[in-house]
Amino acid sequence: MLRVTTALALWCLVPIVLFTATAAEPAAELGLVTGSEKGTYYQFGLNLQALVKQAGIDLSVYPSKGSIENIYAVYQRPATQMGIVQSDVLAFVTRVQSDPVLKRIAKKTKMVFPLYNEEVHLLGRREITDFDDLADRRVAIGREGSGTYLTARLLLKVSEVVPKETVNIDTDEALAALKAGRVDAMFYVAGYPVKLFTESVAESDGLALIPITNKSITEFYPHAEIPAGTYAGQPNAVPTVAVKAVLISFDFRKRDCEMVGLFAETVAGNLPWLIKNGHPKWKSVDLAAPLKGWEQYDCVSQRLGKTGHAPTAAKPSGVNPVVDAIKEMLDK
């Protein structure tokens, strides 16, 4: 397994692996759709871009609204072969059997690698000390098309906590609204440390992370913890729940198989480089970890079996049926 301990032992081989990949393969062009420019997805994308450039792969990293947009983008945009999504988003999409497009997306979306746990950040006014306190409050739940939006709606539905108002705005807007008192709390699903909070939240803002310990929620989502001192004014660890970030591709057969396989080979052989030079969350990545309900893209598994080991956002085209289907199911 490509655990961190094994990966560190291979650190001295990094230059050799990169050189070999560069010499053996022609230059490749790939696109990766991520998330907010201040979120962990985007930082991971930039780390991957820097790594694979050394192997002759030109990786364009696109910001986006998040997981729901990303699933459809990988299916629909020719220059976007990969995306990062939350595990619960695709799990939810697979439940939709009435739409033929969604059925095809669910069937053909494949895992390149599992990445890391994404903690649910619930940031609010200091007087809000528990998830259940969101009842009768104004809560920002993320922009439609984001994984935060889906997870927030699922958590509220499962817990039967009913806010006074839910506000569909992106995380930058939500934080500004929270500071201005226009909302009382905001959701943000991302692996800590989140750049938006480390750069834009001060102790003087009077905000705090709200624990998520509701039993109805923890029956469905795995426990997680945001360590003490991760953010300003956070003296104690905060219990929460998490989802898994997953690097995905779409099984188009023959179109991008070789390029995605080369990309995966480069990443698998150079995890120590990412741990040393990338976002802190790379330290928790296990590229070989099993992930229930996900099948690894055979273009990746076959390639690894043989070897053993910021531009502007792409323009969306029209309506995203994934968003509409999710809203329809959650509103029932």
Question: Where are the regions a protein language model picked out?
Answer:
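Bacterial N-terminal signal peptides
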Residues: 7-18
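Bilobed "Venus flytrap"/periplasmic-binding protein-like clamshell domains
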Residues: 27-53, 118-180
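Extracytoplasmic small-molecule ligand-binding "clamshell" domains
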Residues: 28, 32-33, 39-76, 80-85, ...
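Pocket-flanking alpha-helical
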Residues: 49, 62-103, 174-177, 193-201
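Pocket-lining segment of extracytoplasmic ligand-binding domains
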Residues: 87, 97-98, 161-256
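A structural signal for short loop-to-beta-strand junctions that line the ligand-binding cleft
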Residues: 101-115, 231-238
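Ligand-binding clefts/hinges and TM-proximal coupling segments of bilobed small-molecule sensing domains
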Residues: 144-154, 221-292
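An extracytoplasmic/periplasmic, membrane-proximal ligand-sensing/linker region
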Residues: 173-176, 180, 190-203, 209, ...
